[in-house]
Structures are given as structure tokens and as C-alpha cells.
Amino acid sequence: MKIAVAGGTGIAGRHVTGSVRAAGHTAVVLSRSAGVDLMDGHGLADALRGVSAVIDVTNTTTARRARSVAFFGTVTRNLLEAEQRAGVGHHVALSIVGTDRVDFGYYLGKRHQEELVLAGPVPGSVLRTTQFHEFAGQLLDRFRGPVALAPRMLSQPVAAAEAAAALVELALAGPAGLAPELAGPQEFWMADLVRRVARARGQHRPVLAVRLPGAAGKAMAGGGQLPSGPGPRGVLTFDEWLAAGGATGSVPASTGPASTGRAGR
């Protein structure tokens, strides 16, 4: 089976690509480095020839509503239109737990993406996951000064490799609409996770938790990004991920569910 991975060069994408290949299937990376521009659709027609399913893990770093909605809307529409023409039978999108409850700019873009996929011309599935373990390090990297900041938010982080394995499993199983939410095994305050990453990197600067303004900040601090009900849970804890070199980026890309322990239900 040939599976295309949109955003296949990012953190999630590398794990998804590895999981596809480990399962014995062919991975086609949809990225600019592979000659595909998802913002204008260039190269999509050729790249999707013979593809049975597309897994979309594209991302943007903007927190602004208009930019997020524009990015995810443009990419999703271009993918779905090209998939329909190419006869692709399944579109799988990675989303975030809390997208339906937290009115944060970035999340509103993901919400728009979900709506397009679930109402689109190609049978679709949406998998919402909690933040990846890697997210804490990404937050730390945004601050180069003596102090780092983290949003005051509760999270139940999951390993990117386990999320990737779940996405591939979903792609192989067939369209499911909105799938059960995937979360990690433990609940933390995000600032605590950022502090752990800082210590693992040998940094001793303080990490301050800052509550974001408005209803979005209240929702984040109140557990709006925690899973809303029972569903699959990853097994790799944050501390195990750290011990494996996660804070320094030395954890290898996924080679399939066995690389980190398959996400259990």
C-alpha cells in the first residue's frame, strides 16, 4: 500500500514515515524538498499517483487566528481536491485534543481543518492527540534569555512516535470520522515539563508559568487540553522519553509501534 505523508519532514512526519515503512508499506513524502508545495498544490498530482491514503501532519507555528485558519484551510483544500482527482480513498488528519473547546488562534485553524476533512470529498479520519513530549523542548527553545516562559496549562503529553503509529494504524483501518482521542499516560503542568527538559539539557534558568489572557487562557489552565473521555493511551512516560535522550533530540525516528511500545487502549 502506498501512503503519502504531508509534512513528512517534521517531528511527527518523520515518525509517521518510519511507521509506514516499518509496517511494510511505501511512504511518499509530500514536502517542498520533494518537489511538492502544499500551499499552491504544485507537484501534488504527480506525487499522489497510486496513493491509497494520505496522512496530513503539516503544521504552522503561528498563534494568530487568521493565519492559522488560512494555512490549514489552504493546505487541506489543496490536498482534498488533489486526492479526489487521484482517486485516493482515505485522508487522515492529525489534530489536537481541546480543539473543540479552546478558542485559541492556532486551535481555531485546526478546528477549521477538522471541519473540512470531515465534510470533504474524500473519506476522512481525524485523530486528536495531546501535546507531544517534544513540545516542552520547543517552548524552551523560543526563549534565549535568562528566563523561559511556559503557558499555564495542564497537559497529558504523548510520545510523537506513538501518535505516529496510531495515525498509520488508522490509515490502514479505513475511514473512521472523528477517532477517539489519544493521550499520554500522565498529567502535568506544562511549566514542569519545560523545567525537566531544561535540567536535562544542563540549563538552570527559571521557567515561569504565565496564564494566557481571556477565555482561551482560562480553558488551558482549567484542563481544556486534557482528553474529554476514555480512549487510547500511550505508554511511554515523559521521564522515559527524557532518559532516552528526548531533550537533546537524540531519540530516533519511529520504526513502527515496537520502537516505543504501542499505544494501548
What name fits each language-model region?
Residues 125, 138-158, 162:
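A conserved pocket-lining segment of Rossmann-fold NAD(P)-dependent short-chain dehydrogenase/reductase
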Residues 134-145, 170-180, 203-205:
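Glycine/proline-rich active-site loop of Rossmann-fold NAD(P)-dependent oxidoreductases
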Residues 87-90, 95, 100, 112-138, ...:
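Conserved beta-loop-beta element that borders a ligand/cofactor-binding pocket
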Residues 12, 54, 160-167, 182, ...:
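Non-catalytic, hydrophobic alpha-helical segments
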Residues 1-23:
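N-terminal Rossmann NAD(P)H-binding glycine-rich loop of SDR-like oxidoreductase domains
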Residues 187, 194-256, 261-265:
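Mobile cap/lid helix-loop segments that border enzyme active or cofactor-binding sites
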Residues 149-154, 180-187:
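Glycine-rich Rossmann NAD(P)(H)-binding loop
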Residues 25-86, 96-101:
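NAD(P)H-binding glycine-rich loop region in Rossmannoid oxidoreductase-like domains
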